[in-house]
Amino acid sequence: AGPAVTSIERAGVVTGTRFEDAWATYCRIGGLVPENHNAVPAIQTVSILNAMESTLRDARMNFSDVVRTWFYNRDITAWYDQFNRVRNRFFDARGVFQCRVPASTGVGGGDVGGPALTAGLLAVRPKNGLVRIEAVDSPLQCPATNYGSAFSRAVEIAYPDHTRVLVSGTASISPRGHTEHADDVAAQVDRTIDVVGALLASRDLSWDDVTNGLAYIKRIEDAGAVTNRFERKRIEGLPLMIVNADICRDDLLFELEVNAISPRARYNHGLG
């Protein structure tokens, strides 16, 4: 049998689960929406972040435990800069920048109720010093915080007997933070594959270790091009789902997030 799972409710609705294994306590939260869907997007963002924090509190955790976030913003390109400013202020007030900035995805999306955004997160609290969690820099891109986006390129969770890497939503961004190959989907996919591959390799993982991925495409007609580029890169059998969603810049057509697990431990934890 697996671990016991405890449901977490907010306003009578299950919005998360809490569970444990031998190494850590986990909290997965999803489907959060703002209290007032008619408020301006900035106020709705504050509401979402507060909901994240209160739900974490119900799980006896806090923002320092968060390793991964997801934000699905309606009309994302119209107010992404504003969203970033609100998130930055919230993270700064909670000391997130002094601890560990989580990996994240921020793409276009929405809820049928019409809010400006919906959100979710994954939090992990190790039970002892045998689990190491750290942000991962990209070998081919600058930190996203350099251009005002509060997320890490990836987060590594190193256990005594295996390693997990959670790669943020990644797009065709240059080392200086500018869009590369604007409006060229094939070139953007190639660049993104190279960036994600380098991230994985920096933690001694490869595409063979990827357990699942989500590819976001701005234009549904580009789905075939995405599949073609992975085949040309000889990345086959990847458990990848392609989703039609807007990307955070007008000239970006593609974004990719992946999770990877290796049965190899990266550190000597003093066991055995």
Where are these regions (language model features)?
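N-terminal presequence-like segments and the immediate start of the first folded domain
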Residues: A1-G272
